[in-house]
């Protein structure tokens, strides 16, 4: 299992924080997420994902149509996505 740190920008931080889409998408895979926001009131947010089977599975998952729909609903700007793997 892997732990990932992911950063990206969103259109509306409050909408992103309130959305159930993360749990709906990642929960069935056994992946949990802790959310973070930039205290400088920017649109940058971050997550720590635990229980990720492996990076390849995670990357394939977030490139799926279902993930694209969830990201769109959450206002995620996919072009800003940065993923770090625990060393």
Q: What feature does the model see in each segment?
A:
Residues 1-87:
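Short S/T/G/P-rich N-terminal loop/turn motif that feeds into the first structured element of a domain
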């Amino acid at each position: 299992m892997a732990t990932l740190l992911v950063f990206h920008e969103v259109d509306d931080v409050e909408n992103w924080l309130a959305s159930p889409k993360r749990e709906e998408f990642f929960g069935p895979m056994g992946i949990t997420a802790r959310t973070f926001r930039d205290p400088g009131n920017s649109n940058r947010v971050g997550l720590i994902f635990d229980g990720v089977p492996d990076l390849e599975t995670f990357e394939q998952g977030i490139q799926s149509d279902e993930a694209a729909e969830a990201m769109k609903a959450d206002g995620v700007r996919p072009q800003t996505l940065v993923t770090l793997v625990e060393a």
